[in-house]
Every structure is written in C-alpha cells, then in structure tokens.
Regions:
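ADP-ribose/NAD+-binding catalytic cleft of ART/PARP-like enzymes
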Residues: 1-66, 77-92
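Solvent-exposed, well-ordered amphipathic alpha-helical segments
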Residues: 22, 27, 109-117
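Residue-level signal for functionally critical sites in structured catalytic/ligand-binding pockets
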Residues: 61-69, 102, 107
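Charge-dense polyanion-binding interfaces
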Residues: 78-115
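Short amphipathic alpha-helices within nucleic acid-binding modules
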Residues: 71-77
Length: 117
C-alpha cells in the first residue's frame, strides 16, 4: 500500500510520546493471538512491537506500518484493532485521510462494537 506524503508534513516526525492509532482488517482474519493485515497479508500478534525501515520514494512511502489517527467505522465484516505507535518511532501523517505510516507499531486489542464482543 502506498502512503502519499502531504505538503504540510513533508518530513518524518519523531514521536515524543506513545500515539494511539487504529488498524482495520477483515473479521475472518482475527484470532485470539492476532490478525492478518488486509493489503500485505502481514501476520500481527497482539502486544508485540513490530519494526521496519520506512521505504520512501519521491512523494510516497512504499514500506511502513499504516494506521489511522481516528477510529474507522466498523461493520459486521471488519474489525478495528487498537494500536500504539511507540514513543521514539519515526512517522508521517496525512490529514486528508487521517492516516499515519510509521516504522514501529504495537497492535494491542480488537475494539468492541455492536457487531461483536
């Protein structure tokens, strides 16, 4: 998945504190220990810190952990995962899509909603 670098946020930001964020995935990919991402099919385990090097190409980022700054709308067919971008992480922000891409992320838990407990 490609992240477009916003004109107002051209440089990476270093997180001065843990940042709350959310990922979205399909309901059938979630299990008690983790989940599988929608686009890259990456297997995440809950409460584990994942690290990568950001892949930057001109005005886009081609490698990194994507997440949302606002909790997305959930349905019967998807689940929302609460995550943290840990303090000290390098990240970019795009306000048009309320989206982050970071070099570190910690998936914490599935967020409960009216469709599942």
């Amino acid at each position: 998945m490609c992240f477009w670098i916003h004109d107002e946020y051209k440089k990476a930001i270093i997180a001065t504190k843990d940042i709350r964020c959310w990922k979205m995935t399909y309901s059938h990919t979630v299990h008690k220990d983790g989940f599988v991402s929608v686009i890259q099919k990456f297997r995440y385990k809950f409460n584990k810190t994942y690290k990568t090097t950001l892949g930057i190409c001109d005005r886009s980022i081609t490698r990194g952990f994507h997440s949302y700054s606002k909790k997305p709308y959930s349905t019967l067919y998807n689940k929302i995962i609460y995550c943290i971008i840990p303090k000290g992480s390098k990240y970019y922000y795009n306000p048009c899509f309320n989206e982050y891409v970071s070099n570190q992320i910690i998936p914490i838990k599935v967020v409960k909603n009216k469709y599942y407990e």
